Each structure stands twice: as structure tokens, then as C-alpha cells.
Regions:
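Histidine (H) residue identity feature
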Residues: 4, 42-44, 63
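Extracellular/periplasmic catalytic domains that process cell-envelope and extracellular macromolecules
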Residues: 20-23, 43-45, 51-53, 68-71
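Structural signal for hydrophobic/aromatic residues that build the beta-strand cores
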Residues: 31-33, 53-56, 65, 76
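Double-stranded beta-helix
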Residues: 62-124
Length: 124
């Protein structure tokens, strides 16, 4: 499936989307990355994750995935040991949630201008 630059799409299969999973304690997510696409840093507070890269490769650190290809798509499947793994997208949770700027300045050892730029970019 060709995708435009920086495209990232998640198709979930959890109890909410697929009723047959009710009581099974599993869920799945299909991840599609267009060239330059990124799955922002996040955690799953109620589950571990097993990620299979189905097409090409991505790079990941403490939980983000990114397609570094300039012209090719990446496709991955993430499987979870929970029917409801949840997801907390860290940029939005940290900079879009109303945490006091002084806390963020001290936590990230940076200045107010930088924090305000991050807050502005992550307000939903």
C-alpha cells in the first residue's frame, strides 16, 4: 500500500474492534509507516509488546518506531499480552497535558522557550 511521506497509521484489533477477542487477553495492531513515518515515543501501561517487522526494517529505542527509508513503506504487526494494552503517547502526555512549565523545564534541563515550543506543537 503506497503511502505519502511521514504517514503513520495504526489499525487495531482489540476487544473494542473485534468482539471475538473478548476474554482472550490478546490484541493486535497493524502499523504502517510511509517514508519518514514515525510512531511517537509511547508505553503500554497494561501490557508487554512483541513487535514483528513484516516488510523492510525500522529502528526503535525505548519504544518508538521510525521508517528511515526515503521512498519505501514499512509494515509491522505488534502483538500484546493483554486484551487492553493501552497506549500513552509521551510527547502528548508530557507537553500537551497541562503539566506546569517549571516542572518540564527542570525535568528536561532546558529553558522556557524550548518548553513552550514543545507545548505548542503537542496541544491537541
Amino acid at each position: 500500500m503506497p503511502m505519502h511521506e511521514s504517514f503513520f497509521k495504526v489499525t487495531k484489533a482489540s476487544e473494542s474492534e473485534f468482539k471475538a477477542l473478548k476474554g482472550q487477553s490478546v490484541s493486535l495492531a497493524l502499523l504502517q509507516f510511509g517514508p519518514g513515518g514515525i510512531n511517537p515515543a509511547h508505553i503500554h501501561p497494561r501490557s508487554a509488546e512483541l513487535l514483528f517487522i513484516l516488510k523492510r526494517q525500522t529502528k526503535g529505542l525505548v519504544h518508538f518506531q521510525m521508517n528511515e527509508e526515503e521512498e519505501k513503506d514499512v509494515v509491522a504487526v505488534a502483538a500484546f499480552g493483554s486484551a487492553n494494552p493501552g497506549v500513552v503517547v509521551l510527547p502528548t502526555s508530557l507537553f500537551g497535558s497541562g503539566i506546569d512549565s517549571e516542572v518540564l523545564i527542570k525535568s528536561f534541563k532546558t529553558d522556557n522557550v524550548t518548553i513552550q515550543k514543545l507545548i505548542s506543537a503537542n496541544m491537541g
